[in-house]
Amino acid sequence: TNVFQNVMLETMADREDVVAISAAMPTGTGLSAVAEQYPDRFFDVGIAEEHAVTFAAGLALGGSRPVVALYSTFLQRAYDQILHDVCIGSLPVVFAVDRAGLVGSDGETHQGIFDIAFLSQMPNLTVMAPKNSQELEDMFSFAFAQEGPVAIRYSRGAAYDGLSDHREAIRVGRSEWIHTGRDIAVIAVGSMV
């Protein structure tokens, strides 16, 4: 979340078209500093994830580059809006999917375990999961360069800084081999790498 916050502050300093949207979670998603520094480009729509996504679609149609920051478990509330309002039209909306995966102390309602399943079937949507903080930064740079929607899912807690010697350019549809062996294959996504 801190890495995302820093990426947003740096990006918004460089690009006036980038706006941030929260659904009553600016502190939890790392957008409170964005709200303070860029109050005219930060929107908190309240507990209304569906509205957050439709609002982002409208802003994208108007020329903005919206970033919708939501907890994974609450993003599923906006399934129809993601599909119909953003993905079918291939609008340039970035979804910052916070608390993806198991989140322990947040309780059973906050486990972000369905986002890969429902986001991966969306047309025109690129879904990514960084293995470390450098890759998270690179994925947001990649997302802002795209003409269509991108979802970046990341776990709660401190960002992992290991495996930085494996830094490569972000390419869609590519996996990364960390170690090669002959007996078994271990497949991991995001912070589990």
Protein language model features and the residues they cover:
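Conserved hydrophobic/aromatic pocket- or pore-lining residues that grip, position, or stack substrates
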Residues: A20, I152, V186
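Thiamine diphosphate
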Residues: T1-P149, A158
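Aromatic-enriched
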Residues: A158-E176
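Short, small-residue-rich loop/turn micro-motifs
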Residues: A24, Y154-R156, G190
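A generic structural signal for well-ordered coil/turn residues at beta-strand boundaries
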Residues: Q146-G148, R171, T180-D183
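Glycine-rich phosphate/diphosphate-binding loop of Rossmann-like nucleotide-binding domains
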Residues: A185-V193
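Short boundary motifs at domain starts and secondary-structure transition points
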Residues: L9-E10, S175-H179
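A short, charged/proline- and glycine-enriched loop
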Residues: D14-V18, H179-I184
